[in-house]
Amino acid sequence: MRVRKRKGAQEHLENNPHYVILEPEAAKGRWCEVFGNDHPIHIEVGSGKGAFITGMALKNPEINYIGIDIQLSVLSYALDKVLASQAPNVRLLRVDGSSLTNYFDAGEVDMMYLNFSDPWPKSRHEKRRLTYKSFLDTYKQILPENGEIHFKTDNRGLFEYSLASFSQYGMTLKQVWLDLHASDYQGNVMTEYEARFAKKGQIIYRLEATF
């Protein structure tokens, strides 16, 4: 979902270089220096307005989190949440999910989150889906052996597509939830969209898969 252009968004990001990594290519292989520790790194591709990545960072101070989104205005709203939280273990990148190998070394990322990604429902747009095989190729390069992807969506079509895509790629489906909010799963941190969908009673699907 597109967010209305936010005035001053670019300046907002540029004025906060501690949290927004403006030259991420230079951080490749050096993320431990960026964070000042060697804690595990988890990334969220398509981080939206930052509720999930900020919530996770506050909940798990022993893990470093990186929120990634290509939309300028969206990332500026995520920065608002990061600044308000003052979480020391979160950073933001404005880059495309298809280019992650430009910013992370092999095995440098320990876990990935894909939350409420654009479903791109038309067949001609299949290659844009973040669970398409070319994206999985990219993710595999930056994750360690048995690296994990945690995926959430309200879109049944995208969920079924992703189940098939992960399986066809040879990934292992560790756990699958067909109605996350009706399950006994503990520790769920919601995105902005998820909270909105939950109020409407929409079903949320979730899975965990490993390479």
Curated annotation (Swiss-Prot):
Belongs to the class I-like SAM-binding methyltransferase superfamily. TrmB family. SUPFAM superfamilies: S-adenosyl-L-methionine-dependent methyltransferases. GO terms for cellular component: tRNA methyltransferase complex. The keyword Nucleus does not apply. Its EC number is 2.1.1.33. The gene is trmB. Residues 124-129 are annotated as: Interaction with RNA. Keywords: Methyltransferase, S-adenosyl-L-methionine, Transferase, tRNA processing. NCBIfam families: PRK00121.2-2, tRNA (guanosine(46)-N7)-methyltransferase TrmB. This is tRNA (guanine-N(7)-)-methyltransferase. The keyword Methyltransferase applies. The lineage of its organism: Bacteria, Bacillati, Bacillota, Bacilli, Lactobacillales. Catalyzes the formation of N(7)-methylguanine at position 46 (m7G46) in tRNA. It comes from Streptococcus equi subsp. equi (strain 4047).
